[in-house]
Amino acid sequence: MRTIKPLLTTVSIVAAGLTLAACGGGSTSAGDSSLSGQVGIDGSSTVFPLTALAAEDFQTVNSGVQVKVGSSGTGGGFEKFCRGESDANDASRPIKDDEAAACASAGVAYGPLTVAVDALTIVVSKDNTWATCLTTDQLGAIWAPGSTVANWNEIDPSFPAEPIKLFGPGTDSGTFDYFTGVINGEEGASRTDYTPSEDDNVIVQGVSGSKGGLGYFGFTYYEENADKLTAVQIDSGSGCVAPSAATAQDGTYAPLSRPLFVYPSIAALARPEVAAFFQYYVDNDASIAEGAQYIPLNEAQRTTLKADFAALLAQASTAPSPIAS
């Protein structure tokens, strides 16, 4: 499978128009050489490789539209999006109330599209031979605000007295919000004495370079670095379950399986080049997800995606046509 190197924070990809079917969907086709302009997308580092690959594939059959995909974190991306600085925002969690209010105040209308499923993955170094499975309570004990857990044997007396070195996403990350919400019971509630980064490769390097390292990020980053890291099985009360496409889809990898989103602006979708890109993204969602080593939607979820996009296109068809970026 093809992979996108998530070390990059901005990708500029030349892509262009497809002949867009009437509102409601339809097939895409190449060859509309009159299509031009730019599409700007920012947001989640977790969703970044997926959208970047969609843009890359769009380029192979079209030319003339520049698609720029950035990676400033879900929260940082929503700040830009609600200021009108991007056409869409990648997100690893739903938009928050304060973000929705900011968009509403700025007159930015949008809609969420679920483009893939993720298994938020807890990782340790290859030198860690003891933490093969952790309970959600143990994770909470490690990551809770004010936690003083410093060594592995404080989590389980059978573990060695090895210092725990923690790595994770920064506070602008949707992954941080999701993890803290399901593990600590409140979004943003976390101990602060860890190494944060919006670049998941920094987390990979930190955990893999420390015998007692522990971190978390999206499943695709684990798959790309499985030679350096070990994925920890999670026990939420029904036994140890490893992260995988199957366990994320069937819900057994609870509570760390989650949907991944792209939020396009309704006004941006009124521009032909933006609508064409997202039509391509939706129509080819399964192959894009598989190509980027993500967990694709099941048939029911894919049907919902197409219906959601058709509804957004219908709204865009009545929106004032903005000036192309």
PLM feature spans:
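Bacterial N-terminal signal peptides that target proteins for export
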Residues: 1-11
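C-terminal motif of bacterial Sec signal peptides marking the signal peptidase cleavage site
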Residues: 17-22
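Flexible loop/hinge segments at secondary-structure junctions
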Residues: 23-325
